[in-house]
Structures are given as C-alpha cells and as structure tokens.
Design a protein with these regions (language model features):
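Single conserved hydrophobic/aromatic residue that forms the stacking wall/gate
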Residues: 1-13
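Short, conserved glycine- and acidic-residue-centered signature motifs
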Residues: 5, 45, 132
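Canonical AAA+ ATPase core
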Residues: 11-104, 144-149
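Solvent-exposed alpha-helical segments within well-ordered globular domains of core cellular machineries
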Residues: 30, 47-50, 54, 64-72, ...
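Non-catalytic accessory segments flanking P-loop/AAA+ NTPase cores
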Residues: 60-72, 84, 102-106, 176-200
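Conserved AAA+ ATPase small/helical "lid" subdomain
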Residues: 84-136
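C-terminal engagement/docking regions of AAA+ P-loop ATPases
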Residues: 121-200
Length: 200
C-alpha cells in the first residue's frame, strides 16, 4: 500500500492497485520513529514532518511494564486480539467532540500569543529552520482540544504552554552549534515559550 499525504492529514489518499481513494473524515495516521542511527532509517523531509500534529515521546517502559512485556511474549500472547478490545468512543461521539471543539473560544490575545511563540522559532540563534504557519494552526487546534478535555469551552495560556512542546519539537531543526551544546528541540521550545510574555 502506498500512502500519500496531500496538503494535510485531512487530505490523505490511499493508492492501491492504481486506484486513488479519499479517506474518511476520521482517518488518522499514527507513526513511530526509530533513531536515525539505526540501519535502514532515514529522516522524513521537513514538509512531511510538518503535517503531523504532534510528536509524543513515550520513553522506555518501567521495570514492571518491561516484566509484563516479557511475560506476554513468554506466553506467546504479545499480540492483542482486536475482538478483545472495547471501544471507548463511537464514531458519532468522536464526531460530536470534534464539532464541540470547533466552538471552543480562543481570545485574540491568545492567537497573538501562539503566533509570537512560533515566530520566536524563526529568529532564535539555536534554530536553523523554524516552524511554519501550519505549526501555529496546529498549536491553536491542539490547545482547543486540550481545553475541551479539561472541561472548558475556552483556551487559556496554560493550555498553549502545555501543547507547545509537543506541537513544535518535530518541526524545529536546530543549528549544529545548539546540538553540540546539548540542546534538544523540547529544551529550545521551552526557552522560547519563557521569552514570550503571557497574556493577562
């Protein structure tokens, strides 16, 4: 199967047997990323990375979690059967939440706050390539979704500060000097956020 991302993740087409199909409105792409140093692993182009809403780093499992993984593999039960999974949301409920998110209020001062954070990535000496306007849109959407999950119909500066590292870290390319000094995209993002005055 050949997946092609066109204009955004909302416009993903699947090409199979020479036929192109537009995917449904709830079609979502989740991708894993291996270290670039691993054989056969290559960096995605910036334009493709920019189409992913967020990057979430899972980290290593705890001792208990790793023992659980070993037990499941030992019992040959490592694969979860789809029929044993219980849905937590129906398609209709998910679409309803999406419609609710559209009505989450974002004050103009917070739109400026988002834009200022993203613009900082373009002027920072630690950043070789900053975030595009698509990152601003992603940060606004992620902030609205997070506010909704917190039971609110409005976005706060704290929502923006919470989602910003996840939205920006895969979109920033650091300078060689910054990398040699031990900076990571998350660390740089946090410093840039701290530079921007929080709206009152």
């Amino acid at each position: 199967r050949d997946l092609r991302m066109s204009r955004g993740l909302g416009d993903v087409y699947k090409r199979q047997d020479g036929t192109t199909h537009q995917m449904g409105e709830l079609y979502t792409i989740l991708a894993t990323q291996n270290p670039v140093e691993q054989e056969g692993t290559y960096k995605l182009p910036e334009a493709q990375l920019d189409r992913f809403l967020m990057k979430i780093t899972m980290g290593y499992p705890s001792l208990e979690e790793e023992v659980d993984i070993l037990e499941r593999h030992h019992a040959n039960a490592s694969l979860v059967k789809l029929e044993s999974l219980t849905p937590v949301l129906t398609k209709e409920e998910l679409l309803s939440l999406r419609r609710l998110m559209e009505h989450v209020f974002v004050d103009r001062t917070l739109l400026q706050y988002i834009a200022l954070i993203v613009q900082q990535t373009r002027t920072s000496k630690a950043v070789y390539l900053g975030a595009s306007p698509r990152a601003s849109v992603a940060m606004m959407q992620a902030s609205k979704a997070y506010a909704l999950l917190q039971g609110r119909d409005f976005v706060t500066p704290e929502d923006i500060k919470f989602v910003a590292p996840y939205v920006l870290q895969h979109r920033l390319i650091l300078t060689a000097e910054a990398e040699m000094e031990g900076y990571s995209p998350v660390k740089v993002t946090q410093r840039l956020i701290d530079k921007v005055e929080v709206p009152k």
